[in-house]
UniProtKB/Swiss-Prot annotation:
InterPro entries: Aldolase_TIM, DAHP1/KDSA, KDO8P_synthase. NCBIfam families: KDO8P_synth, PRK05198.1. GO terms for cellular component: cytoplasm. Its EC number is 2.5.1.55. It is found in: Cytoplasm. One of its GO terms (biological process) is keto-3-deoxy-D-manno-octulosonic acid biosynthetic process. Transmembrane segments: none annotated. Pathway: Carbohydrate biosynthesis; 3-deoxy-D-manno-octulosonate biosynthesis; 3-deoxy-D-manno-octulosonate from D-ribulose 5-phosphate: step 2/3; Bacterial outer membrane biogenesis; lipopolysaccharide biosynthesis. Keywords: Cytoplasm, Lipopolysaccharide biosynthesis, Transferase. This is 2-dehydro-3-deoxyphosphooctonate aldolase. PANTHER family: PHOSPHO-2-DEHYDRO-3-DEOXYHEPTONATE ALDOLASE (PTHR21057). Belongs to the KdsA family. The gene is kdsA.
Length: 278
């Protein structure tokens, strides 16, 4: 039985479905603020607990020439402003122990990227900040093996850890979601479904360019399946203009579609939630 915990006013692992959403990368201060305010507005109207996400550095872009973000210090300044002015918890990913320490002073949730989910020093450093640690399951990792990442965080003195499913490698340049992973991982910690990276086509390329592709048309159906399977929260990269996003636009959800997707998710959540004991 998992124990719920809180990120400010957002309960993780409780009865309410929550949303983690924002642009893939911080494109500018103005854009980060715009997206946080827009998504927060939708979530407030729908009474959905919300955590803003954005990266200050996309360290594993396919091409050296791809936009990576504003960097650690400027990115953390912008995330702090989002948290303060929009009044929402914020999440960002960290790639080494020094970043974990610095980001832990600012953000509410430290995310361990899927490619780094087995890096013990990074897990321990993130745990020791005392902030919530969200570990993404590697595309190459069995769901049951994620219990070891959870144990590393907890044995470092931090009980606030959750896991995120983002698809498994399926041949070359493709991912598939095995919904069995969700209840398996939920034996160990609260589970989040990454609805947008799960439809990514890694390094698939487009018109000869070294970029990842995506199939965003499958975001709604996979999200619905994950909520039906009992996830605690949903993670989405949301953008107001996906074709011109500076990172991962090919698999982002268009902001104008967000409310409709969330409406269906809430209906499913209500349908699969057992009635409260009288």
């Amino acid at each position: 039985m998992i124990e719920p915990f809180k990120v400010k006013d957002v309960e993780i692992g409780g009865p309410k479905l929550f949303l983690i959403a924002g642009p893939c990368v911080i494109e500018s201060e103005a854009h980060a603020m715009k997206m946080a305010e827009a998504i927060s507005g939708v979530c407030k109207a729908m009474k959905i607990p919300y955590i803003f996400k954005a990266s200050y550095d996309k360290a594993n872009r396919t091409s050296l020439s791809s936009f990576r973000g504003p960097g650690l210090h400027e990115g953390l300044r912008i995330l702090a402003k989002v948290a303060d002015e929009v009044n929402v918890p914020v999440l960002t990913d960290v790639h080494d122990t020094e970043q974990a320490t610095a980001a832990g002073d600012i953000v509410d949730v430290l995310q361990i990227p899927a490619f780094l989910c087995r890096q013990t020093d990074l897990l321990v450093a993130a745990a020791k900040t005392g902030k919530v640690v969200n570990v993404k399951k590697g595309q190459f990792v069995a769901p049951n093996d994620m219990q070891y990442a959870v144990t590393k965080v907890r044995e470092s003195g931090n009980q606030r850890v959750c896991l995120t499913e983002r698809g498994a490698s399926f041949g070359y340049n493709n991912l598939v979601v095995d919904m069995r992973a969700l209840p398996i991982m939920r034996q160990f910690a609260p589970v989040i479904f990454d609805a947008t990276h799960s439809v990514q086509l890694p390094s698939a390329g487009k018109d000869g360019h070294a970029v990842s592709g995506g199939q965003p048309e499958f975001i709604p159906v996979l999200s619905r399946a994950a909520v039906a399977a009992g996830v605690d929260g949903v993670f989405m990269e949301v953008h107001d203009d996906p074709p011109h996003a500076k990172s991962d636009g090919a698999n982002a959800l268009d902001l104008k579609l967000l409310r409709g997707v969330l409406t269906s998710l809430l209906r499913i959540r209500e349908a699969v939630t057992p009635p409260a004991a009288s």
